[in-house]
């Protein structure tokens, strides 16, 4: 019996059905002879079990099923989920699993490549079940929304109701970084929306004719540099990064000597990080000089000032530079309107080649008749475009005029503006000071009012807040100020930050006085507004004599307690502002870990909050010279007395300490982390001296021009200008 093969037979012959369980290879008992008369009857429309069908054929009346009982489905029905082990599907071969496909939210396709039909399961045994109406129907949600007028749901994929035997892909796809699932599986993440989707959602509606009437709205981003706290700081070329003619001449002579005496491999691979571990700085000084000369020679070669044949000395110098600190590649020179050839927009054809001594050749000087791009004479530290060679400008050593490195003209020639009224012209001229004024006024008004609320409610049974309340108020107020003016003036809100950015990031020196004046004026206005709003509370709290009202601490900062000496007060402001400067430079460094769009202001608001909590107990944590001087002037005008300026703490405590602290904090960050060439920390020592000498000479010329001219000097100056 064990070796006998049992053939599957059907227990339903009259109905023409087949028992699929026997076809699946399931063993069955041999058919026993039935003593009852078999009466053929129609199959029940309900897909019942084979037992019910067999009993019906044998003449037994089937049991009546009540409506409360669940409908019994056959396990062989295509609508019944199979128990036990199931087949897993295979991903189509033409499925694109690349990261780009997944970033653009295109899920795994379940359609065949040729016909486009839905991929059916591969049967284990038996024929392929036909496609049911339930499977072919996409979803009932879209049908209802079309009829009812509701907005269709686009965030989730239409999912079938009930069981299904359609095969599922087994390849693990990358999780989509958004809650909106378009064609993929159920991917849940806490990382927020994808950048592409976020940028699309933040785009507002724009009428078709709006761009024609307001062309400034559609101009490219980063048309002008903005040294601010709302986004990464700009990368500019500063005078210390550009070689002089003498340095070019010496570099060419050294290159010829190095061709005859090749250097050690350790020196060649210096910038690749392969440095021999040694404490002898003299062994790498030559490599440092060669690496710097190579970068400068690449600059000269790019602008046609040096022949490329003189630059190929070693194998490493033939490799292109890829360091992010080389900001020459970041300057968009093609957008600068110049009289250049359209075939090579990166350099004008009229640039004279340099001879061996680093100066233009005589033939090139004679043939040089076409005008060069006009370079404005403004701040020495903004960019190389500020440097125009003069008669006393290092004896013609400066080559900045021959290298078009500027991408922004401070005379607003590269921008498109919407000038509709007369005020729009004035606003364009003073847009940065106006933005700084508005931001400081809003920031300090909120801060002063929060302090007044806590001070004047101190005698009440339930005071309205405490010191922690004011700390959070100052942090959120600073965040608001950065959001207001971050894209226009940069929202420095602090003279110490403006001076620090001038020294270490090339912020124009000519803009520093305007920024400081706007910040002091904004603090003055904010103090007047706050006093006007809480005047009755101040009188109720301290009386009509403002000198003894004990509300001065809500406006200005000073040592809060008698045991806090001068050194403690000074270094409290010094350390607090140094940490603030480190945070500003870290958030503005695009090579470090800059936050996302719009997050810099929020993070700096939190930084101000924690600084107020940490350093506010000793002195009130001014961290800002204008935040103290503006209210002092306002309180003196309101009648708080002239004793506000008798104590010199407001000079060395609120001005010297924050400015020196910001400079020191920026030095620490650049010495430890920053690698850009615009920082003086990364200048060679000779370049620092040369830049200082050049800066003193230029400002000496400007001061001499401000003096009344003597007789005969005006004509000589006019002739010199015409010769240029």
Swiss-Prot record:
Cellular component annotations (GO), alphabetically ordered: plasma membrane
Positions of region (Disordered): 1-167, 248-267, 302-396
Superkingdom to which the source organism belongs: Eukaryota
Glycosylation site list: 565
CDD domains for the chain: MIP
Topology versus the membrane: Multi-pass membrane protein
Extracellular side: 456-472, 535-567, 617-647
GO molecular function term, any single one: glycerol channel activity
Protein induction: Expression is higher in vegetative hyphae than in conidia and infection structures.
TM helices/strands, residue ranges: 435-455, 473-493, 514-534, 568-588, 596-616, 648-668
Knockout consequences: Leads to a slight reduction in the vegetative growth rate and delayed conidiation.
Cytoplasmic face of the membrane: 1-434, 494-513, 589-595, 669-724
Subcellular location: Membrane
Short sequence motif named NPA 2, residue ranges: 624-626
Low complexity bias locations: 252-265
Free-text note regarding domains: Aquaporins contain two tandem repeats each containing three membrane-spanning domains and a pore-forming loop with the signature motif Asn-Pro-Ala (NPA). AQP4 has NPA/NPS motifs which is in accordance with the fungal aquaporins (NPx and NxA).
Function: Water channel required to facilitate the transport of water across membranes. May play a role in the vegetative growth.
Name by which UniProt lists this protein: Aquaglyceroporin-4
């Amino acid at each position: 019996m064990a070796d006998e093969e049992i053939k599957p037979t059907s227990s339903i012959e009259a109905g023409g059905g087949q028992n699929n369980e026997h076809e699946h290879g399931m063993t069955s008992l041999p058919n026993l002879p039935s003593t009852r008369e078999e009466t053929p009857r129609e199959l029940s429309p309900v897909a019942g079990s084979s037992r019910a069908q067999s009993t019906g054929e044998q003449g037994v009346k089937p049991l009546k099923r009540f409506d409360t009982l669940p409908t019994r489905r056959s396990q062989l029905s295509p609508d019944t989920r199979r128990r036990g082990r199931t087949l897993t599907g295979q991903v189509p071969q033409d499925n694109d699993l690349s990261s780009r496909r997944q970033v653009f939210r295109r899920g795994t396709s379940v359609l065949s490549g040729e016909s486009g039909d839905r991929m059916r399961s591969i049967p284990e045994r038996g024929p392929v079940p036909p496609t049911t109406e339930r499977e072919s129907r996409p979803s009932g949600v879209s049908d209802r929304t079309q009829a009812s007028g509701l907005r269709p749901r686009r965030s989730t994929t239409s999912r079938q109701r009930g069981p299904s035997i359609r095969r599922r892909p087994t390849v693990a796809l990358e999780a989509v970084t958004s809650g909106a699932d378009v064609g993929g599986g159920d991917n849940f993440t806490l990382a927020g929306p994808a950048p592409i989707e976020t940028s699309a959602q933040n785009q507002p509606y724009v009428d078709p004719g709006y761009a024609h009437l307001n062309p400034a709205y559609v101009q490219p981003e980063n048309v002008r540099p903005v040294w601010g706290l709302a986004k990464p700081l700009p990368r500019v070329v500063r005078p210390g990064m550009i070689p002089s003619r003498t340095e070019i001449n010496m570099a060419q002579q050294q290159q010829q000597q190095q061709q005859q005496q090749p250097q050690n491999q350790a020196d060649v691979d210096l910038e690749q990080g392969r440095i021999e571990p040694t404490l002898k700085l003299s062994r790498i000084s030559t490599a440092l000089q060669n690496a710097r000369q190579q970068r400068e020679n690449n600059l000269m070669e790019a602008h046609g000032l040096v022949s490329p044949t003189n630059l190929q000395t070693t194998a490493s110098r033939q490799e292109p530079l890829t360091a992010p600190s080389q900001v020459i590649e970041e300057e968009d020179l093609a957008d600068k309107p110049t009289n250049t050839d359209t075939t090579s927009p990166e350099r004008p054809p009229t640039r004279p080649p340099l001879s061996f001594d680093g100066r233009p050749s005589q033939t090139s000087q004679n043939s040089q008749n076409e005008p060069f791009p006009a370079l404005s004479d403004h701040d020495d530290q903004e960019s190389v475009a500020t440097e125009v060679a003069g008669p006393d400008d290092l004896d013609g050593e400066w080559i900045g005029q021959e290298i078009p490195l500027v991408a922004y003209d401070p005379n607003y020639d590269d921008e498109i503006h919407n000038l509709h009224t007369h005020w729009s012209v004035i606003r364009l001229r003073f847009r940065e000071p106006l933005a700084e004024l508005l931001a400081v006024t809003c920031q300090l008004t909120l801060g002063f009012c929060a302090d007044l609320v806590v001070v004047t409610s101190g005698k009440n049974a339930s005071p309205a807040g405490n010191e922690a309340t004011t700390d959070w108020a100052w942090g959120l107020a600073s965040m608001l100020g950065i959001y207001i003016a971050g894209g226009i003036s940069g929202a420095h809100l602090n003279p110490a930050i403006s001076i620090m950015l001038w020294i270490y990031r090339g912020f124009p020196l000519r803009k520093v006085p305007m920024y400081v004046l706007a910040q002091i004026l904004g603090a003055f206005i904010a103090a007047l507004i706050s006093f006007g709003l809480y005047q009755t509370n101040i009188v109720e709290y301290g009386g009509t004599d403002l000198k003894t009202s004990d509300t001065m601490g809500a406006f200005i900062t000073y040592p809060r307690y008698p045991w806090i000496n001068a050194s403690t007060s000074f270094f409290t402001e010094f350390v607090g502002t140094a940490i603030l400067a480190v945070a500003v430079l870290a958030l503005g460094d695009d090579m470090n870990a800059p936050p996302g769009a719009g997050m810099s202001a929020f993070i700096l608001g939190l930084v101000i909050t924690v600084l107020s909590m940490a350093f506010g107990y000793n002195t009130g944590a001014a961290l800002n010279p204008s935040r103290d001087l503006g209210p002092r002037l306002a309180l003196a005008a309101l009648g708080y007395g002239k004793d506000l300026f008798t104590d010199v703490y407001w000079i060395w405590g609120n001005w010297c300490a924050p400015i020196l602290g910001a400079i020191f904090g920026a030095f620490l960050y650049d010495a430890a982390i920053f690698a850009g060439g615009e920082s003086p920390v990364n200048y060679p020592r000779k370049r620092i001296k040369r830049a200082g000498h050049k800066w003193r000479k230029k400002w000496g010329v400007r001061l001499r021009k401000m003096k009344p001219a003597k007789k005969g000097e005006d004509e000589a100056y006019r002739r010199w200008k015409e010769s240029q």
